[in-house]
């Protein structure tokens, strides 16, 4: 004798309202200039396509960074209007082929000042002003911890 049971019940979930927010994605690494991308958040349940993704990037912000001694305003550099010689670097950062950079208008905030690069032991303060609001953050580049005794062992019979 085989018995099968099943139930169906419609469940309605009340999803809270969506409020667009600013997303700030920044990094500074040892020996590299700071790079900041600013975009608008997207609703989780909205449809997504390339155009809606690309339209979410923000331009027109005022972005400053300080290392405790020097404060600079970062330059807005957009993919459709890059300074000569920077195309390969921008393509690598954005993950877009160099041949397609001009087709997109993605703006990043950085500096072409070679004296302002990430340094081990420094703490950096970021300030972003956009649409009448100011957002702040800080980060530090910590001293790297060296590996004491790296060993690679290959088990017999494994390739």
Which positions does each model-derived feature cover?
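A sequence/structural signal for flexible, mid-protein segments enriched
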Residues: 8-159
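C-terminal motif of bacterial Sec signal peptides marking the signal peptidase cleavage site
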Residues: 3-6
